[in-house]
């Protein structure tokens, strides 16, 4: 029994009005009662949630902070669906975590989502945070946004302390993943899921006119340059996004960027969402928290 058959239904007709928003809404009800502080932050075109696990000091610009970009194929999920993961990350990193509820497909393009992520970063800068105090992190599609945001910030002369990616989708082109050996065993994604994602991304980009032209499809792995933040990636050994994780690490290393990939055998895509119930998820997030602490001093 896997999630793959459920996702396959939506992938056959991705443009139908599926109630993707209900996933995050339902997750809000299911979040356990805890002493974690969750503060809503208004951004120009979206919102964010500033999360502090018990014992973590307020986000006052004096210590480290994490910008977290959730996964969900640019289509679904949010701060609620990722609430347990983010709370654990806040605990292990000893840092507030700003989770961006960026605009989603199909009504909004990936470029618009990226702008929301940039706005969240700027919100922290206006609160007094310096780049070397800020870590960019994301899972799945959020990994794409985190790397792309790091590249945009690099062009603006900003270098965050580190980049952390969990099971990242880093290449929008579908063919390399569909040809990967894990495509037949991935418990989450079949080949049709990548067909559907490509269709949704292209359709939304075509409707977003930038400087008189449709938004271009951006491939971050084609724009790896020296000077990007040090990078840690955690990925399952059985998922098809292992392809993207390894390709990114290879290209980052070739550009002189410190890049580490930790492969978790026997796990599924984004298994860290099962924290704290699954021991491996908790161990992974603890390691990520240690990495963030070390990167920010």
Which sequence ranges carry the predicted segments?
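A glycine/proline-hinged amphipathic helix-loop "lid/cap" segment
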Residues: 1-56, 207-212, 297
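Alpha/beta-hydrolase superfamily serine-hydrolase fold, recognizing
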Residues: 44-49, 53-297
């Amino acid at each position: 029994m896997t999630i793959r058959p459920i996702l396959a239904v939506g992938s056959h007709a991705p443009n139908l009005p599926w109630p993707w928003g209900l996933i995050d809404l339902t997750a809000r009800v299911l979040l356990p009662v805890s002493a974690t502080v969750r503060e809503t932050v208004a951004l120009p075109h979206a919102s964010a949630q500033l999360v502090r696990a018990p014992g973590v000091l307020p986000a006052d610009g004096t210590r480290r902070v994490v910008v977290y970009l959730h996964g969900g194929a640019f289509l679904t999920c949010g701060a609620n669906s990722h609430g347990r993961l983010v709370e654990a990350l806040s605990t292990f990193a000893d840092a507030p975590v700003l989770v961006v509820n960026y605009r989603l497909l199909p009504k909004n393009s990936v470029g618009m989502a990226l702008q929301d992520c940039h706005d969240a970063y700027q919100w922290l800068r206006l609160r007094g945070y310096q780049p070397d105090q800020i870590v960019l992190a994301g899972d799945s599609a959020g990994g794409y946004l985190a790397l792309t945001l790091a590249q945009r910030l690099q062009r603006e002369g900003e270098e965050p302390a580190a980049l952390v990616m969990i099971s990242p989708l880093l290449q929008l082109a579908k063919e390399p993943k569909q040809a990967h050996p894990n495509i037949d065993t991935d418990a989450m994604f079949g080949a049709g899921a990548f067909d559907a994602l490509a269709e949704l991304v292209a359709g939304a980009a075509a409707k977003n006119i930038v400087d008189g032209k449709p938004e271009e499809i951006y491939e971050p792995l084609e724009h790896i340059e020296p000077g990007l933040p040090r990078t840690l990636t955690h990925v399952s050994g059985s998922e098809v996004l292992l392809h993207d994780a390894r390709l990114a690490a290879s290209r980052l290393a070739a550009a002189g960027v410190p890049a580490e990939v930790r492969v978790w055998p026997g796990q599924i895509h984004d298994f860290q969402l099962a924290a704290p119930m699954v021991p491996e998820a908790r161990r992974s997030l603890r390691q990520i928290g240690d990495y963030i602490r070390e990167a920010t001093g």
